[in-house]
């Protein structure tokens, strides 16, 4: 199936980044969120990113204009969803919220449309089961920032068809990404490796082994990481990190995935 028009649900950092990737890849893209101010902020962020590419000589002014013309933003979901080939959900990492969105997308999108989730940890099988088209539901997990990071995890739920998985995989390749096909396990691969490392860094801080700055220096200077695990935790959001750890802990029942008490305390404090 050829993908020509894409709907991205959620105009935050991830959603707007995904919309930018799709538009730069030649897709007509509709960016949707629940309030106009969120949509405007997302589109403004994309314009800023594109302007930087022009300044750096990585894109011509004409190319920027063409990409911008392929983008539009809306609040009303009904009209936006009626003629798309692919819908990508990129909202808060909460299963109830995602299920509600997929039920609505299922009722609004054309029968042929693929419904993809940018979830970083939640089960695609459970999300797909809320729809009448589970064979056309898959994971399409971009990493932050989406326009820069090459990796895309393409996740096959229990009912996801091979055709759906291959279509999304090929689309990611078309955008110049490095997609990988994965089975539906908690945290997939990226977050199953990365988030426990961040949790362990938090545990090291909790035990007073080193300061936050020193822990991040170890990761950057010793492992060659561009960003330390605690700085990365702040960028991702401690609440999101805690949620992912809870998904891993519940999904595997393994104590190595137990969230650090300090992480839980920080989230309770609103940090």
Annotated model-derived regions:
Residues 1-52, 56, 108:
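NAD(P)+-binding Rossmann beta1-loop-alpha1 motif at the extreme N-terminus of oxidoreductases
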Residues 2, 166, 173-184, 203-207, ...:
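NAD(P)-dependent Rossmann-like dehydrogenase/reductase catalytic/cofactor-binding core
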Residues 9, 17, 32, 74, ...:
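Structural motif
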Residues 20-23, 65-86, 167, 172-176, ...:
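Amphipathic alpha-helical segments at domain termini/boundaries
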Residues 27, 145-154, 226-227, 246:
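Acidic/polar active-site rim loop that often engages polyanionic ligands
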Residues 37-41, 52-114, 122-123:
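Rossmann-like NAD(P)-binding element
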Residues 114-184, 188-192:
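Rossmann-fold dinucleotide-binding core
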